[in-house]
Amino acid sequence: MSDRQVVVVGAGLAGLSAARRLRTLGIEAIVVEARSRVGGRTEGGLTADGSPVELGGQWVGPTQTRMYELIDELGLETFPTYNTGKHVVQLGSSQTLMASHRGAVPKLNPFVLADLFQGLTRFKRIADRVPLDKPWTAIDAKALDGQTFETWIVRHLRTSTARAYFRVAAEAVFSAESCNLSALHAMFYAHSGTDLEGLLSVDRGAQQDRIVGGSVRISERMAAELGERLHLDCPVRQVEQDGSRVTVTTRDGRAFEGDRVIVTLPPTLAGRLVYRPILPSWRDQLTQRLPAGSVIKLYAIYDEPFWRHEGLTGQAASDQGPIKVTFDNSPPSGAPGIMMGFMEADDGRAAARLSSTERREAAVDCFVRYFGPKAANPLEYIERDWMAEEYSRGCYGAHFAPGVWTEYGPALTEPVGLIHWAGAECSAVWNGYMEGAVRSGERTAEVVADELR
């Protein structure tokens, strides 16, 4: 191990992956984390009977090669998301059942289906041309980034049902309304994770597999390798650099010194730290323009997954909230039955103003609407409001409003002196996902290691 040292701010997947890679490259790393736990936007919880629930990010799927490799390296295992039977689909006034093998495209009348397919085809054709390493250089980048995704939807889809499909997709993927993000960002993001249908699918899609014991076990096992080099309950207040060294100071006055620092906080939170000297305007202005998504993740616990006995997957997709997307999140054994739903975007922000009791009532009403009266009396209710988390302030990740990619894109990962940036939002591949966080952390560690050699 060399005498060089790097301070990593944040013990989520990006920060821990960065520290792990640095140490394999012979450079010492210490990790400073504000929370009393590791995992960042992945978090574990337990039901009353001790069954694990995942309060944050949880899925892995095809082409997320680094995640599967890491799971294997750490001695963990995956199991498939339950996807046997039919999905409940509610678009407009009609509620239908759709066989799970149809993927992410529901059964619709021929006119609507034709409209949806041409929209998906057009979207994919443009998205596939967006350079993942430099989205702002895409063909027609200014035009795409100058309009909201909602504007693109209205211009290129003719039927209300096809438009509703894209709007629900935006909420499910970004936990934001289609009017909150630029069309360029929607296309970059889809291309980053293969394509839009892949982001929405289970089999052969982003929701294909889960991790036995919960995704937070990845962070916990990486953290165990660090030992005393991991410092919890250390909210960072200031990052100071003098041209040769960096000093990271916590709120209670503790100081950690290094040759470089890797900040792995979500961009908006990274912008709230104090920097000495102050950040250049091009970086600070970027952090002011990358809001996190709005989401509350909710669970209803039952004796068993009763929906399975009725031939249902436990998955619902609807354009009527407050829960528009659900999944069967039961453990591999199949018991207890764990129904999971999301309150996202406008629905999430509205629900955040309610009491937990009111949110529970609203959630159960949605589960009953999708899966019938047996959903009315859960044994237990669990929720995590990510907007209320001090060191996240939202999930799943940051989204780019119109104009941000083309005006500030290079600033996302460009170092500022001795300060480097990493995180799920900084990855060209699987941006915003656990895979992206790991890739970004490792890539940034390699860049830093090259500088210090």
List the predicted regions and their residue ranges.
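Flavin (primarily FAD) binding-site architecture
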Residues: 263-281
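Short hydrophobic core segments
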Residues: 9, 32, 236, 255-268
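N-terminal Rossmann-like FAD-binding beta1-loop-alpha1 element of flavoenzymes
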Residues: 4-31
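Conserved flavin/dinucleotide-binding core of flavoenzymes
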Residues: 16-17, 25, 195, 245, ...
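Active-site/ligand-binding neighborhood in enzyme catalytic cores
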Residues: 131-235, 243-245, 264, 274, ...
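Conserved beta-strand-loop-beta-strand element in the redox core of flavoprotein oxidoreductases
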Residues: 240-256
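Glycine-rich FAD pyrophosphate-binding loop
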Residues: 23-48
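Core beta-strand elements of the Rossmann-like FAD/NAD(P) dinucleotide-binding domain
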Residues: 2-4, 251-260
